[in-house]
Amino acid sequence: MNGTPNADPLASLLTLEGVPSGFAAARDGVDALLRDRGLRRTPSGLTAESLLRGAAASGELEGSTSGLETVRVDGGDEIARAAVRVSTELLGLAPLMTSRPLQAFARIHALAGRGALPDEQLGRPRDAESAGRLRALADTLVTQTEAPAMMVAAIVHADLATAAPFASHNGIVARACERLMLVARGVDEKSLLVPEAGHLRLRAEYESNLRAYANASGSTGVHAWLLYAIEAQTVAAELSPLRD
C-alpha cells in the first residue's frame, strides 16, 4: 500500500487484470437482482433468512457439523451458535465499519467468542503484531478509495482471515465483516446476499485462494483472491432468498 498521507491505499489493485471489470460486472448483477426483486418485496423475514443461511454456512466453514436445517431447528453445535450470535447483532454495527472499524471488529469477535474464551480475550488482538494488522486494516477502511465496495469487502475478509488476529473464530469474524461491508458501503443495504454460502459452495477454491493470499509473494495471491471473490459474490447473489 502507498504510504503517502491520504493516498488511495487500494489504488494498485485497480490495475490488476480482470479485477475492475469483474467487480463492475458482479455489481451490475447484484444491482439487477436487488432492483428487480428486492424493491418490490423486502419483508424483514428475507433479511433474517439471509442472515441465518449465512451464519450456518460460516459455521460449516469454521468446522461446524450442523447444516442449515439443524441450525434452523435447534441452533446447531457451539460453532454454529457462535455464528448465529454474530448474525443477530451484525447489521447494527454497519455504521462502525466506515467510521470506527476497530470497534466493529472487536464487537464481532466478542459475540463469536463468548463462552469459548476468557472475557479478557474477547475482542482483543492476540499480540502486538495482530493489533498492528488490525490498525492498518482499519486505517485502510477510513481512507478514501476509488476501489469498488465489493473489492473492499473482499480485502477485509481476506486480511482478517489470514492474519487471524484474535484467539479464536477468525473465519467467522472475517466472513461477518465482508457481509457487513457490503451493507455499510451500500451494495446490499438490506443484507439479502449470502456471501458465506457462496464461499461454502466454492469451498475448495475459497480455502486455496485464502492460502494464496497469505503466502504468495508480491500481488499474485491478492490478484488470485480478488478474481475468486468476483465469482463468489456472483454465487452469493444466486443463493439469496430473493431467488426462492
PLM regions: where:
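FIC/Doc superfamily catalytic core
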Residues: 1-244
